[in-house]
Amino acid sequence: MKPTLALVCSALLVVSVTSTASAQLVAAKDGPIVYGHHHLNTANLDAQKKFFVDTLGGTLIKIGTGNTEVVRLPNVLIFFRTNQAPTGGTRGTTVNHIGFSVPNLRQMVDKVKANGFQMITKTEVAADREVKDDIAGPAQAGGASIAFALAPEGVKVELVENRQQAIPITVHHVHFFNPRNAEMQAWYVKTFGAKSRTGGAFPAADLPGIALNFSPSADPVVATQGRALDHIGFEVKNLEEFCKKLEADGIKLAVPYRKVPALGIAIAFITDPWGTYIEMTEGLDKVSD
């Protein structure tokens, strides 16, 4: 699916971070709901670790009594459902791609290529946007240069340059595609308390440490479950009470609230009206320190 012009006019939120961000989920102190994790299906964990650890610079950690391997990046964890071949990549789903910001985009793009991964910037931006050596320059004055990489098993990753950023990499955004993108933005604002933002190339909503971007899609999109990015995750304070509120608002829990002693956290799942599978957690900010 070729993205619309709204995607490629990336006047994206430049997330403010500090040098303490390496402690993971530091944004959790800034609000009752923050972004928590990406959860990938994979049949090739080594390849995923080569991309997210060796290339992007994440830290491989083990959590819980089962020593679950997780990649830690500033303000996001990446979990893996291993030995689970995805049914497709992220493109074509409600979550088209995930984004990270870096202070030196040229350096990161060169590293992605040197490690054997494909850059797909040319096919992911508008035909009239100049791409030089796999980097698309700012779409407008004051905008950011961007690039797109294809991680293993079809996970599309956007890299956004933020030259003022003090750390090597941090989570930047989750980018949703939907023919009803404005309605989708409103749902995330209402459900998770994200702060609505308009006036850019596409509707957006902000939570501490991350932007949720919503581009229109000319083509139908499918649910995330089973695809390379199986679900997204939000870290929620007082999760049990939050789940009761969701149910009172008519949102059905796909997986009811429960505690996971092996990880020292609590979880619940919902699905948004367009098929995005969403895990809600409480405690990831502690177990990942």
Specify the residue positions occupied by each region the protein language model found.
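Mid-chain, structured segments of secreted extracytoplasmic proteins
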Residues: T65-F117
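N-terminal secretory signal peptides that target proteins for export/translocation
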Residues: M1-K2
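Mature N-terminal segment immediately following signal peptide/propeptide cleavage
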Residues: K29-T65, E69-V70
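Bacterial N-terminal signal peptides
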Residues: A6-T20
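Eukaryotic phosphotyrosine signaling hubs
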Residues: Y35, T94-H97, A228-H231
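Short, surface-exposed ligand-recognition loops at beta-strand->loop->(often short) alpha-helix junctions
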Residues: H39-N44, F100-V102, F176-A182, E235-K237
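Amphipathic alpha-helical segments
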Residues: A43-L60, M108-N115, R180-S196, A248-D249
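Vicinal oxygen chelate
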Residues: S22-G31, V109, K113-F176, R197-L207, ...
